[in-house]
Each structure stands twice: as C-alpha cells, then as structure tokens.
C-alpha cells in the first residue's frame, strides 16, 4: 500500500501521513470470525496498571486468526484482504473447499482469487504453510511456531520476515527479523513469504488526537514529575537525574541495562544474539 500525504491545512495535518488502503477489498468483516473485545486500559485482574500509556481509543472487535494453519490437504481461495484494527498487518479471508472460512495474516503479494494450501506436501508458494524441515534453504517465511501445533508466534508484524539459513539434525536454523539466528524444531510450521503492509512503519501519526483514537495515552518524562512519582523527579528547574544511571519509575536501572535472564532455557537454541 502507498503512503498518502496531506497538504498542511492545519497544524495537525502538517506532516501527517496515512496508508491509502488500496489493497483492502472490503470493509465488512466475516461475522462468524468476530469476537467481543473488552478494553483493559493496561490493567490486570487486580485493576493495577501493568502496561503504561494505554487506554481509550475506538471500539474494536477481535478477528479470530488461524495461526496454526492446520487445515492440511484442503485448498483454500483468498476471498478478501481486510484491515484488522488489532494488528499492524492486514488479514486475508480464506474460503476452503469444504465450506469453512478462516482468517490468516496476509502475506506480501497475496491477491484475491489465489489458492493456498497447508501441510507437509504443500508447494513453496506465498501463503502456503508447511513444516520448516520441508522449506528450502534461503526461503523467506513468517508466522513461525516455537512448538509444533501451538500456532505461529514469531514474525507476525507488518513488513517482517525471517529466512531459513540451514538444517542441522531435527532443527532448522532461522534468521529472525531482529537479526537473531536461532534453531527451531523442523516440525514447527511456518508460512512462506513476507508479511504484507510493509509501509506501516512509515506512517506519521501527526497529532495527539490520532494517537488517542488508537488507544495510546500520553508519555510523561520522569524529570518533570515529583520525587514521589519518579526517581528522576524533583529539583529546581531542569535538574539532572542525580543518579549513576537513568532509572525506571520503579527504581530499576534502564537504558542499556540487561533484563534477560542469565540462565534462560532458550539460550542453547540461540546461535547469534539479535542486533543491539
């Protein structure tokens, strides 16, 4: 999709960009694949904020996505490409030959009318899902499982892709979008191709109100808070932090401080750590 720019008719419009949604073929989602979505506003079951800067925004309905891609041997036809308010990628509605309908993440270059398949015998074609051990070296993939049958967990955001680098025993070596190179069980499934809507990261929100429509609340600097609210708070005027390193609101070091567990079980599967 292309990026649409506006003339600076107001301060909010100046610099603001939007996607032109030229790939979207319908604005009516499949009702049987919708579920109610209650707003959490970043709170947990105790009502405490666990994720800051969330709340408000336009009402949404959840689209039930098929991350498992376990409908083996039954061809499906792409009926529509749709917008999904709950993720950066677009989604595709698939009509299977047996009458079932499912949503999948829409890969790049997937068009209405194309046919897709799942299973070990599927062709290496955009939108097809098969075990990593059956995918040739060099192929770009997305929606990768970490455990067979659990459903895709990695590489699902707009414009992302991973590359199959090699095979070693029952494991397949994959370079992820972050630059991390790791081993994943060959029985885990992945979908061929890159995730579509790659222009998503180039969109400029342009004004605070548009961020609020998306459910994003303001981010306040710690240095302008009071000492009771943040370790950086207090002092006269633009006071320095007054500590050896920047701190989180809860007094933990941040900005360069390592937060990964030193003895993480998944370390043995990581060949090269992600780019900093």
Curated annotation (Swiss-Prot):
Q: Which SUPFAM superfamilies match?
A: Nucleic acid-binding proteins, Translation proteins SH3-like domain
One GO term in the molecular function aspect is: transferase activity
The keyword Acetylation appears for this protein: no
Region of interest (Disordered), residue spans:
224-276
Q: How does it assemble?
A: Part of the 50S ribosomal subunit. Forms a bridge to the 30S subunit in the 70S ribosome.
Xref: Gene3D superfamilies: 2.30.30.30, Nucleic acid-binding proteins, Ribosomal protein L2, domain 3
List keywords of the entry alphabetically.
Ribonucleoprotein, Ribosomal protein, RNA-binding, rRNA-binding
**Compositional bias of kind Basic residues:** 258-276
Protein name per the record: Large ribosomal subunit protein uL2
- GO cellular component terms, semicolon-separated: large ribosomal subunit
Similarity section: Belongs to the universal ribosomal protein uL2 family.
PROSITE patterns hit by this protein = RIBOSOMAL_L2
Q: Does the keyword Ribosomal protein apply?
A: yes
Name any Gene Ontology BP term: cytoplasmic translation
Return the InterPro entries for the record.
NA-bd_OB-fold, Rib_uL2_dom2, Ribosomal_uL2, Ribosomal_uL2_bac/org-type, Ribosomal_uL2_C, Ribosomal_uL2_CS, Ribosomal_uL2_dom3, Ribosomal_uL2_RNA-bd_dom
- Organism equals Geobacillus sp. (strain WCH70)
The role this protein plays is: One of the primary rRNA binding proteins. Required for association of the 30S and 50S subunits to form the 70S ribosome, for tRNA binding and peptide bond formation. It has been suggested to have peptidyltransferase activity; this is somewhat controversial. Makes several contacts with the 16S rRNA in the 70S ribosome.
Which superkingdom, per the lineage?
Bacteria
